[in-house]
Amino acid sequence: MYPAYNPYSYRYLNPRNKGMSWRQKNYLASYGDTGDYCDNYQRAQLKAILSQVNPNLTPRLCRANTRDVGVQVNPRQDASVQCSLGPRTLLRRRPGALRKPPPEQGSPASPTKTVRFPRTIAVYSPVAAGRLAPFQDEGVNLEEKGEAVRSEGSEGGRQEGKQGDGEIKEQMKMDKTDEEEAAPAQTRPKFQFLEQKYGYYHCKDCNIRWESAYVWCVQETNKVYFKQFCRTCQKSYNPYRVEDIMCQSCKQTRCACPVKLRHVDPKRPHRQDLCGRCKGKRLSCDSTFSFKYII
């Protein structure tokens, strides 16, 4: 058991100046070090709390399992000038240390791997490694793969002759086709544009049909931007039949066929009593725009 500990047993003010008030602003000046006063005060508070929880618990006298790490804020400034680790000083990094090494004399004329850093490295410590793994591009991997196939083909060409060359060409064609298939997936547009199409709706539950001459869809797709709601059951429907605004028979926006397949007047392209979703919106069905909107 530890004896009772008084949390206010730290060093007190020098009583030589009897007339000094405790509210004086420079009361910390009589201490030898302000940091010692703060450490003793915090240690006293911690020890008082630990004595209330469990008398056997006492704060450790020293830090355990700690490491000194220096952080350089400005990478352009010299590390030795900016900060230090006690007696140790941060090692200075040469300005040309991150540059790629020159190619060897015996190496073939192949594209070297480029090193790209996503952000500036500002931590200098013995734990952090000086070198970072380079980010390999897919194009470099494909070229290296082609070079490996060529080297294997050159060794096998001496034995098999023209048969090995044909296999190499087939392998290169397959790599090119794979690269072309992967290209459209990578180059997807960041923005999606809207276009207007003709939509035909039918609610099987209520047995109601309605048409819309101008339905806002995502460009080159049948994905409707504004859903249609039935006037009775209020169910949302995507048109199961979306076509171009132009008539398929006469190829005109305003149909002039004797037998009209579409019963929509372009002047009133949509029956608002059946669709209350887009009424009053900026992209309403009864408004026609000659330009595209970006989602």
Swiss-Prot record:
Biased composition (Basic and acidic residues): 144-176
Swiss-Prot/TrEMBL keywords: Cytoplasm, Developmental protein, Differentiation, Metal-binding, Oogenesis, RNA-binding, Zinc, Zinc-finger
Keyword Zinc-finger included in the entry's annotation: yes
Expressed in which tissues: Ovary. Also expressed in lung and muscle.
GO biological process terms held by the UniProt record: negative regulation of translation; oocyte maturation; translation
A GO cellular component entry from the record: cytoplasm
Zinc finger motifs (3CxxC-type), residue ranges: 197-280
A Pfam family hit: Zn_ribbon_3CxxC
Localisation per UniProt entry: Cytoplasm, Cytoplasmic ribonucleoprotein granule
GO MF term set: mRNA 3'-UTR binding; zinc ion binding
Region named Disordered: 80-115, 144-186
Coiled-coil features, chain-numbered ranges: none
Function: mRNA-binding protein required for maternal mRNA storage, translation and degradation during oocyte maturation. Probably promotes formation of some phase-separated membraneless compartment that stores maternal mRNAs in oocytes: acts by undergoing liquid-liquid phase separation upon binding to maternal mRNAs. Binds to the 3'-UTR of maternal mRNAs in immature oocytes, inhibiting their translation.
Entry comment, domain topic: Disordered regions undergo liquid-liquid phase separation (LLPS) for the formation of membraneless compartments that store maternal mRNAs in oocytes.
Family stated for the protein in its record: Belongs to the ZAR1 family.
Protein name from the UniProt record: Zygote arrest protein 1.S
Taxonomic source organism: Xenopus laevis
